[in-house]
């Protein structure tokens, strides 16, 4: 029986070692992707910070307020664009975003609909009984303007058609490799209140046309910034999850190695005792 126990332990050790190779490799890949994602996020933060400053100064200095995306409506319904991931094995990254919506709107879910970005987020949104309006999957590791435009245009149409009174973004903001936080930011109606009189602008020939173009660029820029934050947070969560899995595998291997050695030592001791006992009996 002890010999059978050794074989079972050896089988488990082999299986865990194979799994450890996978988690270790995935952790290294996530670390590499995180490094690239952080670089792209840093660059995008600089761009969006400048865009935000310009937009607020320009809108704040103009008298025109004809753009419908700057005006609220009375519809109580809210559209939430929820950023998740297409791939799993990233800890609570996807579950936390859906749980955030549930916890903050549990008494008003009948007025909430979601646009889900990321295949893995769909399961958690439905699990938390949140209605979905649209789903976007397989967008890739690097956010691009084409995808951002498609999703933003969908939200804009829903808002301008009066189907929703507010559109917001729920995503995981990246602060550091060990700190990410689910946040909600209002997207529509757009609030670009600036300090009036700080900067003077002379716009010709059409002020409304400039505002329309600026608002469109701002919405896409804000959404892209959220996507870059989400991607960096996803890779950080996956890196931590795989590092944790690798450490757990190491701990389990150490425990199994110790157990294997104890059983093996017990078998050897028993065999020696039997040999010695047999020799004594023959005297």
UniProtKB/Swiss-Prot annotation:
Signal peptide: none annotated. GO terms for biological process: proton motive force-driven plasma membrane ATP synthesis. The keyword Isomerase does not apply. It is a peripheral membrane protein. Belongs to the ATPase gamma chain family. Produces ATP from ADP in the presence of a proton gradient across the membrane. The gamma chain is believed to be important in regulating ATPase activity and the flow of protons through the CF(0) complex. This is ATP synthase gamma chain. The gene is atpG.
